[in-house]
Amino acid sequence: MKNKFDSLFINYFAKEFFYDTITMVDRREFNKNMRIGVDIDGVLNDIGQWHYSCGFKFCIENHINRGFNPYKYMMEEQFGLTDEENYKFWKEYIFDLMVSIPTRPYAAKVLQLLSEKGHEIVILTARDNRYLTNQYANTMNFYVEEWLNKNSIPYDEIIAGAGSKKEKCIKNKLDIMIEDKASNVEAISELIPVLCFDAPYNLHVKKDNVIRVYSWYQIYQYFLDNSE
């Protein structure tokens, strides 16, 4: 039976091996430049956690209590909101999403590393202007760019708006997509590999061309492992 000292000793050297491995693989060189599609909500940020935090706050303040389902993707499905309640939520919280939501850990760093290796970063988001009115009408692209720049996220192109992401992947000749929404993951994976950022609402997605990921450095490891 291992004593306490043995466990500490094993854990220490396991950690040392892990960090040595990351340092070693960082020195490898990519040989093929790729056009990498990157979603914003759920990939660059943790939209699920943001939904849970802001959604419960909104529901309590508005005396709404219809349960909660984390396995649904849309806010109105998660909290059972009516169309009117959902619209009210987004009118109140859209700027918090556009301006204040933090990035996932190391998202900017990993994209910087990939960009330095010659890969093209294409931001592909379904965000649109539906909740922006008056002086803020049609400003979503401006706020997307501002948020990316504020968080030091490199990019070569930004493609925003509603419409089929699968068709946009074809039109913009993407080689791989990093995505979280289940329907997008399934559709795009018919064309190109998809790195699916793990979330409760996409757990049912299991396809040959889908690689489930849990962190941005795991994404970096994928590109290292699959470089030519």
State where each predicted segment sits.
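Active-site neighborhood of HAD-like aspartate-dependent phosphohydrolases
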Residues: 6, 13-85
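Substrate-recognition element of Asp-dependent hydrolases with the DxDx(T/V) motif
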Residues: 98, 107-144
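Short hydrophobic segments within beta-strands
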Residues: 39, 124-126, 178, 197
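Short, glycine-rich nucleotide/cofactor-binding loops
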Residues: 94-103
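C-terminal cap/substrate-recognition subdomain and adjoining C-terminal extension
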Residues: 119, 134-176, 181-228
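Polybasic, lysine-rich low-complexity intrinsically disordered segments
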Residues: 2-3
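Membrane-proximal envelope and lipid/glycan-remodeling enzymes
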Residues: 13, 17-24, 126-129, 133, ...
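Short, basic/glycine-rich phosphate-binding loops at helix/coil junctions
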Residues: 78-94, 121
